[in-house]
Curated annotation (Swiss-Prot):
Membership in a protein family: Belongs to the bacterial ribosomal protein bL33 family.
Organism per entry: Clostridium acetobutylicum (strain ATCC 824 / DSM 792 / JCM 1419 / IAM 19013 / LMG 5710 / NBRC 13948 / NRRL B-527 / VKM B-1787 / 2291 / W)
Biological process (GO), any one: translation
Gene Ontology MF: a single term: structural constituent of ribosome
Protein name (Swiss-Prot/TrEMBL): Large ribosomal subunit protein bL33
Amino acid sequence: MRVKLTLACTECRQRNYNTMKNKKNDPDRLEMKKYCPFCHKHTLHKETK
């Protein structure tokens, strides 16, 4: 089952990206290094609800 989720920057807390994940394959919270347009740099983005 694929679910929609939002990725938030860990430094400025802005919700920058929407994505989907398969809960069966990834039961833990998703973490990715992505570009944050508000910080103007690559930062760690974590899954939010």
